[in-house]
């Protein structure tokens, strides 16, 4: 038995033994293209945690279009036996940004390496499996099979507002895609942000230093402040940041650069009888960073954070500028004073400990 597997099993046992008291309430907001990959495995970490109550999953477009993202989320829940968790349809399009405006921007300032649902050309020999571009209302054939269950009635924004009112001060919004659904909830209810306990978001980019100049470094080599979850809908990011959340924790690209889904992880997952581990092993994402998984993990176990920094943060929404969608930061109190929030940005994590938490969660 490998040292990694032994450590994982011990961690899983200790977590199960310590799961007592009130369960932490969370809503997962995802652009859940699948099967497998960071979007799905991150949700599984929360779903598998014995001290977490996942109230629901809200879905928007981003990595994929909303219709296909919803289908993949529903099918994942079927495969891991969690059809008790409702899935709500959210935004199909960004608030202002569009494929046409993005293409005009590229004509002036150069190509954006990754464009999610708008991708028409992929890098050769990419670790990511290229997906053929299609219209928003098309759901391509699904490797994992089509879901039998349906999305819940109502919109994602309505669900977010309703649950925040029902459990004031208790709910974490775990956002791992663009912030369109969150922004719509903010606009729907002025008290939404005040009713939420905290907002965790995998988004923004400060100055990521990838371990090598691989395909995931290309996006940040010349544009270190651009992150896809912001660039898809910069206006939504600004609205969410300015909404008045009591606590905002950002997991930017920087913190994720040392993480990877490794071949050893895959072999470990293959030996597990857990439905979540079986799903992850059947649809592996070997070689890819664990972006969203890390965001859930530092919420589950803040001790994984090696270094974080408090800063004021905002986003460039000047669509005609070269910096449209880029992250803007200042030392607290040194910004322009236009309502930019103070956030906690995770800079580095204890990678080996995170790997154990990641595997233990899926194998539980």
Task: List where the protein language model places each region.
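Bacterial N-terminal signal peptides that target proteins for export
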Residues: 1-6
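Hydrophobic h-region of N-terminal signal peptides that target proteins for export
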Residues: 9-18
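Active-site histidine-anchored catalytic micro-motif
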Residues: 21-83, 100, 120, 125-249, ...
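Conformational coupling and interaction surfaces
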Residues: 22-24, 41-54, 221-222, 228-364
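A short, structured active-site edge motif that brings together acidic residues
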Residues: 86-94
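A short acidic, often aromatic-flanked loop/helix-cap motif at beta-alpha or helix-coil junctions
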Residues: 93-97, 256-258
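Extended, histidine- and acidic-residue-enriched regions that form the cofactor-binding/catalytic faces
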Residues: 100-107, 283
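A charged helix-plus-loop insertion that forms the helical arch/lid used to bind
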Residues: 104-124
């Amino acid at each position: 038995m490998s040292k990694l597997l032994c450590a994982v099993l011990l961690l899983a046992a200790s977590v199960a033994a310590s799961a007592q008291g009130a369960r932490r309430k969370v809503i997962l907001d995802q652009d859940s293209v699948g099967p497998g990959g960071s979007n799905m495995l991150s949700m599984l970490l929360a779903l598998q945690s014995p001290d977490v109550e996942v109230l629901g999953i809200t879905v928007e477009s981003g990595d994929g279009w909303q219709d296909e993202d919803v289908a993949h989320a529903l099918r994942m829940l079927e495969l891991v036996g969690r059809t008790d968790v409702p899935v709500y349809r959210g935004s199909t399009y960004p608030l202002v940004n569009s494929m046409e405006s993005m293409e005009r921007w590229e004509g002036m300032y150069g190509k954006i390496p990754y464009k999610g649902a708008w991708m028409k050309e992929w890098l050769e020999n990419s670790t990511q499996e290229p997906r053929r571009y299609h219209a928003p209302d098309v759901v391509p054939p699904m490797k994992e099979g089509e879901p039998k269950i349906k999305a819940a009635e109502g919109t994602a924004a309505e669900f977010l507002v309703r649950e925040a009112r029902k459990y004031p001060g208790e709910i974490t919004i775990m956002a791992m895609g663009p912030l369109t659904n969150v922004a719509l909830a903010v606009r729907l209810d002025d008290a939404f942000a005040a009713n939420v306990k905290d907002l965790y978001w995998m988004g923004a980019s400060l100055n990521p230093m990838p371990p090598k100049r691989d395909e995931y470094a290309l996006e940040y080599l010349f544009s270190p402040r651009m992150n896809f979850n912001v660039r898809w809908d910069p206006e939504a990011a600004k609205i969410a940041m300015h909404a008045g959340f009591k606590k905002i924790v950002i997991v930017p690209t920087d913190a994720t650069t040392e993480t990877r889904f490794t071949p050893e992880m895959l072999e470990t997952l293959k030996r597990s009888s857990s439905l979540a581990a079986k799903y992850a092993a059947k649809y592996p994402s070997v070689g890819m960073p664990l972006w969203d998984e890390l965001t859930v993990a530092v919420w589950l176990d803040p001790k994984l954070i090696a270094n974080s920094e408090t800063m004021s943060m905002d986003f460039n929404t000047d669509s005609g500028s070269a910096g449209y969608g880029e992250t803007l930061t200042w030392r607290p109190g040194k910004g322009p004073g236009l309502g930019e929030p103070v956030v906690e940005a995770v800079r580095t994590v204890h990678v080996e400990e995170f790997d154990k938490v990641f595997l233990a969660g899926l194998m539980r």
